[in-house]
Regions:
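Gly/Ser/Thr-enriched, mixed-charge loops and adjacent short helices
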Residues: 30-40
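Thiamine diphosphate
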Residues: 38-265, 270-272
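A glycine- and small/hydrophobic-rich beta-loop-beta segment
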Residues: 276
Length: 276
């Protein structure tokens, strides 16, 4: 399913070949999939059901692995989603007539807190950088913020393993990497966290977001397994703040120390000062 998007915009060399294949309707001589020995079928309009049926009928009895390259439009059929593809990758319950959310929490959230903190740190210290694996808005990095951060922001695409290993390398070379990731997705990078980061004692700061039954609401994305999964890895310090003040203090300490990898379990609620 090639809609020319990751969750945010695409990054990486592979996408240049996908664009070439789209532009040539699959006829380009340079074809990543054929180079790997795979059969290849191009579908120009993947939002057209008859075209999909025809393509699948043509390959269902194949005795070889086949890549069906389906070009689609993200958000097809719903104007707000077509206009703002990144925001509408997922959405809280909304009014289909207006596109407005039915749930509008009031107050400061930890994504905004993290964003403001990182921008200030980046301006004061060029060794600070922020890494995401295709979910930059989880820590408040909207397109405008990403432009402000410039080269101090890196989106590796949906590749949590690479994000973790990249952060380790930056830290070992004197940088101060911050990696923001959903709790549900950190499982994808377990090997890199254990071997690349923790065995090497790389002082990486990892912010674990949506670590709660309230963070994500579907079976595949529940953020409830991060504590048993990563808290027992040797050399990793796992912290769980309950207030904004604690969270910011932990970020400060983690980014400035160079002895341990540190993960911070970001509260899934709105910002609290801890008072009743």
């Amino acid at each position: 399913n090639d809609n020319d998007m990751s969750i945010a915009e695409n990054h990486g060399g592979m996408y240049r070949n996908l664009k070439l294949l789209r532009d040539t309707e699959g006829k380009a001589e340079c074809n990543l999939f054929k180079a790997m020995g795979l059969d290849y079928v191009f579908v120009k309009d993947g939002n057209d059901i008859p075209s999909l049926i025809e393509a699948f009928e043509g390959v269902k009895d194949s005795k070889k692995p086949v890549v069906v390259h389906i070009v689609t439009q993200k958000g097809k059929g719903y104007a707000p989603a077509e206009k703002d593809k990144e925001t509408w990758h997922w959405h809280m319950p909304f009014d289909p007539e207006t596109g407005k959310s039915l749930y509008n929490p009031e107050g400061e959230d930890y994504g905004t807190v993290t964003c403001n903190y990182l921008l200030e740190k980046m301006q004061a210290d060029k060794s600070v950088c922020a890494i995401t694996s295709a979910t930059p808005t989880v820590f408040g990095f909207t397109p405008d913020v990403r432009k402000k951060a410039g080269k101090q922001f890196m989106d590796v695409g949906i590749a949590e393993e690479h994000a973790m290993a990249l952060a380790s390398g930056i830290a070992k070379n004197g940088g101060k990497p911050f990696y923001g990731v959903y709790s549900s997705f950190i499982q994808r990078a377990y090997d890199q966290l254990s071997q690349d980061v923790c065995i090497n004692k790389s002082p990486v700061t990892i912010a674990v977001f949506a670590a709660s039954v309230y963070g994500m609401s579907d079976v595949t994305h529940l953020g409830i397994y991060d504590i048993p999964m990563i808290s027992n890895i040797p050399e990793l310090v796992y912290l769980a703040p309950v207030t904004k003040e604690e969270y910011l203090a932990m970020l400060d300490w983690s980014l400035e120390q160079n002895e341990h990898p540190v993960a911070i379990r970001v509260p899934a609620s709105l910002v609290s000062d801890g008072k009743p």
